Amino acid sequence: MSLEMFDKEIFDLTNKELERQCEGLEMIASENFTLPEVMEVMGSILTNKYAEGYPGKRYYGGCEFVDEIETLAIERCKKLFNCKFANVQPNSGSQANQGVYAALINPGDKILGMDLSHGGHLTHGAKVSSSGKMYESCFYGVELDGRIDYEKVREIAKKEKPKLIVCGASAYARVIDFAKFREIADEVGAYLFADIAHIAGLVVAGEHPSPFPHAHVVSSTTHKTLRGPRGGIIMTNDEELAKKINSAIFPGIQGGPLMHVIAAKAVGFKFNLSDEWKVYAKQVRTNAQVLANVLMDRKFKLVSDGTDNHLVLMSFLDREFSGKDADLALGNAGITANKNTVPGEIRSPFITSGLRLGTPALTARGFKEKEMEIVSNYIADILDDVNNEKLQKNIKQELKKLASNFIIYERAMF
């Protein structure tokens, strides 16, 4: 029996989502379009298999084939990131980070991470997160120019003496200097933990410096710029840390791994290892630079005055409208983005004075410089007259026509 016959409600809603993804423009920096081959194996019989433990050391029988699958995922991950050890079992980036903390430090120890309001992530010590409740957290941020001042980070680290320093961000448009972070970590005797969830796809293509050999441990999601399934990974070059990480993930915070997702990670890694991937990642950065240049030419303020990666962060501190207003206006025109706090923020986190835009998903559809210039100018048109609903409606129709030339999926399920 087909899904349409068995559960028409879910079938219809899934197809409405297909329509939304195909007709609109996805510009949330953390979202992307994965391969049909990835989704195909995620919907396979591998979802039936329990496999607590690790390859060759399972608590259940019948794991000979899933052992081979997980081993393949591990080997591809190691090759991709040029590291010695990899754990591919984390169900998400947040659980990967939780596993890193559990492996490296003890509850109550101090961690130093980027402030959430400056572009960090919840799991880097934010008080509302378990990372900010189980561990004592302190923060560094960006200056008013939107960039990390590494001397300021050094001063904070020397004062706070953390056991672990987290480098990585969810809304930082510039290159992260992992070597400088390692210098600082060594000076205070801390572990350096790099969370590259947002930039991993650029890193493996040589479009952003690698955290190796500087970081003791590296985590990432497998979606975002990697375009794989939703999930997490942890990597290191230290055998003893690898053992601690494995124990922290299982049996520490997870039980049976999601073997259908681990297989999908392996498929994604195969794509990431291809020459085609390097072309894609380069275009992601090129498209982001086109976006940044058009917006600046149209007199909009960007945090750090540009971008080195896949995203731009707009600041509306000099405007009458908020990030929430901008988010809504773009949404009415068929562009999905997200409001975001900015350095010098004057509004609440639920309103904000910024907007984060990313190019990974549009690039996955085949958008290049020509299309990005069109889209970027439409964004500027909308934000120049943010309350003009008629304009938003007209632009939505124009963008729908543009999107129809770049269909990413022909069907909702694979």
UniProtKB/Swiss-Prot annotation:
Homodimer. One of its GO terms (cellular component) is cytosol. This is Serine hydroxymethyltransferase. It comes from Campylobacter jejuni (strain RM1221). Its EC number is 2.1.2.1. NCBIfam families: PRK00011.1. Its cofactor is pyridoxal 5'-phosphate. The gene is glyA. It catalyses: (6R)-5,10-methylene-5,6,7,8-tetrahydrofolate + glycine + H2O = (6S)-5,6,7,8-tetrahydrofolate + L-serine. (6S)-5,6,7,8-tetrahydrofolate binds at residues 116, 120-122, 240, 348-350. The record marks 223 as: Plays an important role in substrate specificity. GO terms for molecular function: glycine hydroxymethyltransferase activity; pyridoxal phosphate binding. It comes from the Bacteria. The keyword Hydrolase does not apply. The keyword Cytoplasm applies.
